[in-house]
């Protein structure tokens, strides 16, 4: 199917105005922001403004006709239910962010997600994995006892790995992706969207997402590349180097073969510990 849906949550219901777009970084959250942002009744904030707005330190300007306001916040994916929400290397902290809103949770295969972490490079030409992924994992291990206890086996595998960078990336993906199944178990109003299904069967998947938000279908979401989008850089790109003029396609599916040594795959899958199959089954 490509999507998975849970209940209405501990507080509030699906008729709430706000919703959140979350998921492991490099899993397609920006694409989902662009797609839903073209819906006539939706306004979406990207990361450049979403975190500040939710922390109460940034201005929030929403068109009067908007029925749903989306916040793309992948940094906070695994921390939505925390009393204080923050992320390593990010200056913004917020309290009591989640109040029962609908959640759109992007899910992408382990290997392609990690490949995208390697593919994306910043101004220094360092990969996203080395700029953010590895330091974040080390921070979790050293400063988050809950993480260290929960993933003790996986941390040991990472420390012993022949390909430690890729093993760390797998652990990063594991922690972020585990949050979907945790939220689902709690009965929160979360819909899981597999990136691979979204790009291969966009209309059927997007109809499920739009319905989850309690909105009528708008065919405009199928042609986001023809729309003007807010929060686009001077270079014409959205967060993470996403080109808003690129139509939905499957070019990034199975890209991992260009970036990941086959000898590293078994180590990565051992850390994922069956989660790859659970995601693929959605």
Protein language model features and the residues they cover:
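Short, flexible helix/strand-to-coil boundary loops that buttress conserved ligand/catalytic motifs
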Residues: 46, 117-118, 260
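PAPS-dependent sulfotransferase catalytic core
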Residues: 1-78, 123-135, 232-247, 251
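PAPS-dependent sulfotransferase catalytic domain
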Residues: 81-82, 87-221, 231-244, 250
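C-terminal/domain-terminus segments
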Residues: 50-55, 198, 273-282
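Residue-level detector of family-conserved "landmark" positions at structurally sensitive sites
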Residues: 46-47, 220-222
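C-terminal accessory extensions appended to soluble enzyme cores
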Residues: 249-282
């Amino acid at each position: 199917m490509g999507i998975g849906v849970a209940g209405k949550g501990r507080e509030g219901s699906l008729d709430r105005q706000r919703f959140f777009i979350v998921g492991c970084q490099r899993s397609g959250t920006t694409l989902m922001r662009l797609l839903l942002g073209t819906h006539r009744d939706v306004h979406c904030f990207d990361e450049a403004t979403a975190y500040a707005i939710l922390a109460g330190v940034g201005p929030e300007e929403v068109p009067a006709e908007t029925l749903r306001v989306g916040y793309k916040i992948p940094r906070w994916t695994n921390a939505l239910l925390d009393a204080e929400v923050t992320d390593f290397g990010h200056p913004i902290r917020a309290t009591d962010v989640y109040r029962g809103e609908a959640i759109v949770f992007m899910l992408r295969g382990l290997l392609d997600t990690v490949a995208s972490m390697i593919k994306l490079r910043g101004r220094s030409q360092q990969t996203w994995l080395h700029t953010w992924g590895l330091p974040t994992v080390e921070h979790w291990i050293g400063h988050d006892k809950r993480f260290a206890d929960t993933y003790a086996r996986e941390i040991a595998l990472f420390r012993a790995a022949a390909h430690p960078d890729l093993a760390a990336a797998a652990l990063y993906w594991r922690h972020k992706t585990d949050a979907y199944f945790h939220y689902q178990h709690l009965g929160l109003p979360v819909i899981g969207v597999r990136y691979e299904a979204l790009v291969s069967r966009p209309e059927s998947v997007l109809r499920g997402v739009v319905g989850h938000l309690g909105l009528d279908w708008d065919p405009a979401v199928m042609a986001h590349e023809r729309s003007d989008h807010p929060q686009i850089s001077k270079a014409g790109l959205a967060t993470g180097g996403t080109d808003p003029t690129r139509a939905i396609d499957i070019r990034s599916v199975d890209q991992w073969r260009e970036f990941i040594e086959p000898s590293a795959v078994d180590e990565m899958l051992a850390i994922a510990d069956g989660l790859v199959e659970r995601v693929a089954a959605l």
